[in-house]
Amino acid sequence: MSRYRGPRVRIIRRLGTLPGLTNKTPQLKSGSINQSTSNKKISQYRIRLEEKQKLRFHYGITERQLLNYVRIARRAKGSTGEVLLQLLEMRLDNVIFRLGMAPTIPGARQLVNHRHILVNDYIVDIPSYRCKPQDFITIKNQQKSETIISKNIEFYQKYKIPNHLTYSSLEKKGLVNQILDRESIGLKINELLVVEYYSRQA
């Protein structure tokens, strides 16, 4: 299944706020909430499916990519659900988004694809690059790159940067301090339901 490129508002109306996908919030008409499901029981499969879809659309990844992350998380030590979230959060496109260098994850992915971003002084143009503690993220020293990102930083620095990241406005540099903990996830999600959804595939 390919990456979603359709209307983002339609997705957040169905799944709720997804800050990685869009900075808009769902506007529901009064009395329209859960109209289609208020009189019938929602199946457990649908609940798991919707949690899975939240992850996929928030982080902007394909079905195959998400399944691969679940498989990696299952082989790792610790809680599969928590490891899964750590893998997704440490993607370069997400780190750029959480630092406030881009308004959304698709916006961050575009910066990476267009070679505006350096990791440890080397250009990285792979959005799925897995960041590690002590990695530092900077802007390519070109006026166009700095102008694009400086505008984002000025606006989005009002939002709190999670504890596992640091951004220096003076140096225009982001730093990955550590692997994030569960409380730093910027998404309302039940990751255990996602793991259960993939229990027969991973």
Swiss-Prot record:
Residues 90-153 form the S4 RNA-binding domain. Pfam families: Ribosomal_S4, S4. GO terms for molecular function: rRNA binding; structural constituent of ribosome. Coiled coil: none annotated. GO terms for biological process: ribosomal small subunit biogenesis; translation. It is found in: Plastid, Chloroplast. It comes from the Eukaryota. Its main location: plastid. Keywords: Chloroplast, Plastid, Ribonucleoprotein, Ribosomal protein, RNA-binding, rRNA-binding. This is Small ribosomal subunit protein uS4c.
